[in-house]
A protein has these predicted regions:
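Helix-coil boundary/capping segments in enzymes
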Residues: 29-96, 103-106
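Glycine-biased, low-complexity coil/linker segments
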Residues: 335-337
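Active-site loop segments of alpha/beta catalytic cores
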Residues: 1-26, 83-328
């Protein structure tokens, strides 16, 4: 069974012979997936260091991705002269074609990068965009037309290629809940996502959706409108038992050892137990679980913990499910709660 088929079977609950593994940022030869994204236009020249094609400027102060420090859409008047990037510009999908030319037998994930809501907040500014959702809905819809229009054109081009899934990355949660009211999300964003997911499915591809934070209130919505894979890097925040009870068997989960604590400060035994716990709870005998591995040194993950995570997830392919109870965590040192 090829690596591509193993991932497909896990997503479709069709009897994957082992747990597939996605590597995010290193050790790609060990990954069952390969990722590619659209790139800059070939003729794009930033006006200053860190400027994106969208017109905002990235500020990176540490080893994380950083955040925009300027926002081009300062008000409604700024839309008049704003020119978004051309989704069909020369060179836009060159990297995708390069990856596809030597992808071997792996499952190909085409990523849209930062999408939808997050992209809109980068253009307008986070606080201003949230205020506009309540005070100037027409302006919000115009911004979203720009963002989703660009993405829809990129999707149209990507799904004509032999990719297996389109990946959306929109962080919707805080530690406590959704950034906006769930009903507002359903009114403004759900229909736009539904259209995009239908576009992907109509081309015979899978929908892979990443979101950080406590997004529990919209999980059923995402499943209802067509998400095939839900990628969560903080499964403890959502509650693994609860995820399994309410959504197990309905969607494939791609999860990491919880990045907020376990992956960073867990012992070897804790990491191994948690990997098995994720597999046993979120997966089924036919699939439904994909392991996610990322080197998160920027958050304090040691090389030792990274290697333990690798060993733990790869060891799942040698064992049968045991319905492991949730493994306890060692107490945090005083002052780190």
């Amino acid at each position: 069974m090829s690596r591509k088929e193993i991932v497909h079977r896990a997503i479709e609950f069709a009897g994957a012979e082992r747990v597939p593994i996605h590597y995010c940022n290193r050790d790609f030869d060990s990954s069952d997936t390969v990722a590619c994204e659209y790139g800059r236009a070939a003729d794009f020249v930033p006006a200053e260091p860190g400027m994106s094609e969208w017109g905002y400027v990235w500020e990176v102060l540490d080893k994380t991705m950083g955040q925009p420090r300027t926002h081009p859409l300062t008000g409604r008047d700024s839309l008049v002269c704003y020119v978004p990037p051309d989704p069909k510009a020369c060179g836009r999908l060159d990297e995708v074609d390069r990856v596809l030319s030597d992808k071997d037998d792996r499952f190909v994930k085409f990523g849209l990068g930062i999408t939808g809501f997050n992209q809109a907040t980068f253009l307008r500014g986070f606080e201003d965009f949230l205020a506009d959702l309540y005070m100037d809905r027409e302006f919000v819809e115009e911004i979203l037309d720009i963002v989703f229009g660009f993405e829809n054109s990129i999707i149209e081009q990507a799904v004509q290629r032999p990719v297996d899934a389109v990946v959306f990355a929109d962080d919707w949660g805080t530690q406590q809940g959704l950034i906006i009211a769930p009903d507002l999300w359903r009114e403004v964003f759900r229909p736009r996502y539904a259209d995009q997911f239908a576009q992907v499915h109509n081309a015979g591809k899978k929908v892979w959706f990443h979101s950080c934070g406590h997004v529990y209130s919209i999980i059923q919505d995402l499943i209802d409108i067509g998400v095939d894979v839900l990628e969560f890097l903080q499964p403890d925040l959502l509650g693994v038992d609860r995820l399994a009870e309410e959504f197990g068997g309905k969607v494939c989960f791609c999860c990491s050892i919880d990045h907020q604590r376990r992956a960073i400060s867990g012992t070897r035994d804790e990491i191994f137990a948690y990997a098995q716990y994720l597999r046993d709870k979120l997966g089924t005998s036919n699939g439904g679980f994909i392991a996610y591995i990322e080197d998160y040194a920027c958050l304090g993950m040691s090389e030792q913990n990274y290697q333990w995570i690798r060993e733990a997830f790869h060891s799942l392919n040698l064992n049968t499910p045991t319905q492991t109870p949730i493994p306890p965590m060692s107490p945090l040192p005083l002052g780190e709660g």
